[in-house]
């Protein structure tokens, strides 16, 4: 509701932003040249609400203009279209991360994607329900988490414990995080922490609490739907 939040936002607008982002990132990927794999990271509050109550997993009411069944089908179709588009450029890998807005329905979606793409040799969908995920490429170790459940000061230790072998054979380590609806980079214990913003607009709760963000997110390109590009000629 524009007069309440200062921004007009509905499902049509949000879907348009998502599709524009996919096109923009595909253009960026093509500029890179030899990309070996695309990590499609989308489960950071993708569906925003978690089920029939139209609230977050923890029960905070959310604004939505769809019934929960419509929301799931709409979001799922967006994800399928995105993967189909990305796989034209490089093999795609996607996985689950636990987030606080739609922890359950995000997992249902990753399972549906696994079934949908089960016969695709260039699409890998992991249904591991672990709340965090790690990927190693050469001497780079990437950690993915929502950063709602995990305390920031504990994340460096979690990476060392959960990825003992990969920790010992890598030089560069990063966490790609979400949750705070802002873009921030910080180094903690030799690990780079990157918080990525969102392409979503303002809703009642975020506006009431004063969480106002820049309108230039689509221009910058780094968002919750995060693409980690693994280049075969990249030693970082």
PLM regions with names:
Residues 2-4, 234:
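Intrinsic low-complexity, intrinsically disordered segments enriched in polar/basic residues
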């Amino acid at each position: 509701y524009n007069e309440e939040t200062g921004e007009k936002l509905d499902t049509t607008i949000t879907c348009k932003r998502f599709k524009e982002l996919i096109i923009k990132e595909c253009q960026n990927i093509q500029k890179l040249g030899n990309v070996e794999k695309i990590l499609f990271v989308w489960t950071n509050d993708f569906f925003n609400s978690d089920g029939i109550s139209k609230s977050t997993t923890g029960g905070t009411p959310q604004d939505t203009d769809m019934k929960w069944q419509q929301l799931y089908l709409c979001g799922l179709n967006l994800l399928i279209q995105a993967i189909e588009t990305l796989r034209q450029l490089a093999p795609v890998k996607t996985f689950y991360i636990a987030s606080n807005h739609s922890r359950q329905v995000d997992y249902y979606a990753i399972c549906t994607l696994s079934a949908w793409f089960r016969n695709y040799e260039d699409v890998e969908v992991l249904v591991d329900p672990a709340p965090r995920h790690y990927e190693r490429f050469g001497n780079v170790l990437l950690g993915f988490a929502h950063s709602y459940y995990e305390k920031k000061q504990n994340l460096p230790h979690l990476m060392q414990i959960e990825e003992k072998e990969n920790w010992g054979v890598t030089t560069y380590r990063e966490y790609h995080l979400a949750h705070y609806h802002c873009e921030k980079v910080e180094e903690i214990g030799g690990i780079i922490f990157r918080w990525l913003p969102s392409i979503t607009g303002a809703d009642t709760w975020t506006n009431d609490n004063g969480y106002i963000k820049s309108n230039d997110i689509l221009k910058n390109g780094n968002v919750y739907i995060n693409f980690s590009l693994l280049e075969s000629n990249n030693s970082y």
